[in-house]
């Protein structure tokens, strides 16, 4: 939803207004988080010691690394983000500026990406595949079509369609991945496994931006 709204704002009002509204949303988010009432942690039983953060990290790593299928997907996803973040954060804006219509075209393209993300979530609610992870991973390569279409570059409507498809694919993958984790990872280990999943998936993203 955010990318869709941002695309509309940038393409109609310009990037300056987009940045201003973005800053405002961060302010609102900060106020909302500040006002959240977080329940106190469960008190320890008499004689029980609180587990150190390093012990929690070790236990989380064991839960994560002992499930090889999770490790393989996270490693693969880390390389996906290595390329995707560099494409979306650097290459796409430069190509749009030099070969197409600048910020307005970028906004329209990102609007398509955002709409695709919404549709991907809707499809994930409707589709009940026997192998959700296979479906999620199978639709990710559509992102390569988006990159190819922009590299040529193809007409804006083609960029819109490929961005839409990428949004659908990425959110289908995310929804099916979360479903698979919650189905096969015990509740008491889920938060720790998810932490290593998030870190591992995004670890190469800054390198993609740098390269």
Q: What residue spans do the PLM features occupy?
A:
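Transmembrane alpha-helix termini and helix-breaking/packing motifs in multi-pass membrane transporters
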Residues: 2-23, 93, 98-100, 207-211
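Juxtamembrane intracellular "pre-TM" segments in multi-pass secondary transporters
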Residues: 39-75
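C-terminal transmembrane bundle of multi-pass solute transporters/carriers
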Residues: 58, 65, 79, 85, ...
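Mid-bilayer segments of alpha-helical transmembrane spans in multi-pass integral membrane proteins
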Residues: 1-4, 31, 175
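Short, hydrophobic secondary-structure boundary micro-motifs
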Residues: 36, 42-45, 72-74, 91, ...
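Alpha-helical transmembrane segments and their lipid-water interface positions
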Residues: 6, 29, 33, 204-208
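Structural preference for long, well-ordered alpha-helical segments in enzyme cores
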Residues: 4-5, 9, 27, 57, ...
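Helix-loop junctions on the cytosolic side of multi-pass membrane transporters
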Residues: 15-51, 130
